[in-house]
């Protein structure tokens, strides 16, 4: 019997509900066979799902090239900018189902209940320009150790989209500068270990935020930011991010974040390539389960089982 002195306004739907967390080795098969009720997957994994289910789509991940600024060549901002100007996003997006990334913060992030990108603009990256790239390169060349132009290691997880884009980008770098890279496809564990230890020159990184805020993405490029794998930081962007976090007015905060984001992109230690969608799928026998694409948590508060 319900306790009248301790009741909720929301009715309790199921008579009983148990939650089990399964290992991720066979999670796609487990979802298809209804062993698990919900699953978060990327686009490639989505194609492997079968049966009836509902889908929530989130644009909360930016895939890009993280340049290790401890590497001799990449300690020079001019050379980094030369490389960034040879990324032709229109060409990269041809034949791809992913939207090209012209900024760091993805479209899922909101401020004032509106997409953050409405305040900051969608396009912050430099235009593809061989001429501009050569200007940066020729200016930086006297400072560069050209013996390092061969063998720079690009580490990445297995990813067909990123591999195809890398092939195009590396051809541009080879043609214009004679800069040759070696791609290493790694397991998730090995990639994470190499990224954390700095044992790489370039990493294909999936940038995500722990909360719904531009600052959660941009802090990865601050002096004391968690996940600052590039080693890049500047007093300008650090100050703008701190000011944005302190701003009482969210519209002012958005403008400050946008300036910080532009400053970081100008530093060219992270070169955005494309936005990667995540899909939260719910088995047909369940409803009202919600997913947070930022902190990767699932809300079962009002879950219903049929």
Residue locations for each model-derived region?
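Ligand-binding cleft/hinge of the Venus flytrap
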Residues: 1-13, 168-177
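Ligand-site clamp/hinge motif
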Residues: 5-48
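Solvent-exposed, polar/charged alpha-helical surfaces in well-ordered, non-transmembrane soluble domains
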Residues: 15, 25, 29, 33, ...
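Pocket-flanking alpha-helical
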Residues: 29-30, 44-51, 189-223, 264
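Structural transition elements
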Residues: 98-141, 161-163
């Amino acid at each position: 019997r319900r306790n009248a002195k301790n009741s909720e306004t929301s009715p309790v739907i199921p008579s009983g509900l148990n939650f089990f967390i399964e290992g991720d080795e066979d999670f796609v098969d487990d979802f298809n066979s209804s062993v698990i009720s919900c699953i978060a997957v990327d686009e490639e994994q989505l194609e492997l799902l079968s049966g009836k289910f509902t889908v929530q789509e989130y644009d909360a991940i930016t895939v890009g090239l993280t340049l290790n600024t401890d590497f001799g060549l990449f300690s020079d901002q001019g050379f980094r900018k030369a490389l960034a100007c040879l990324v032709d996003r229109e060409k990269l997006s041809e034949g791809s189902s992913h939207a090209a990334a012209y900024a760091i913060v993805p479209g899922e992030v909101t401020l004032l209940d509106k997409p953050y990108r409405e305040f900051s603009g969608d396009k912050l990256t430099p235009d593809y320009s061989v001429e501009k790239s050569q200007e940066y390169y020729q200016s930086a060349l006297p400072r560069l150790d050209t013996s390092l132009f061969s063998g720079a290691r690009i580490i990445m997880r297995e990813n067909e989209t990123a591999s195809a884009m890398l092939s195009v980008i590396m051809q541009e770098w080879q043609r214009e500068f004679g800069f040759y890279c070696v791609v290493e496809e790694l397991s998730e564990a090995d990639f994470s270990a190499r990224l954390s230890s700095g044992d790489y020159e370039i990493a294909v990184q999936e940038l995500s935020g722990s909360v719904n805020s531009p600052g959660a993405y941009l802090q990865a490029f601050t002096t004391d930011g968690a996940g600052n794998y590039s080693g890049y930081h500047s007093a300008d962007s650090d100050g703008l991010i701190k000011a944005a976090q302190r701003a009482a007015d969210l519209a002012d905060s958005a403008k400050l974040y946008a300036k910080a984001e532009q400053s970081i992109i100008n530093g060219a230690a992270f070169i955005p390539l494309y936005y990667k969608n995540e899909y939260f799928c719910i088995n047909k026998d369940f409803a009202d389960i919600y997913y947070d694409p930022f902190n990767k948590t699932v809300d079962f508060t009002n879950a219903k089982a049929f």
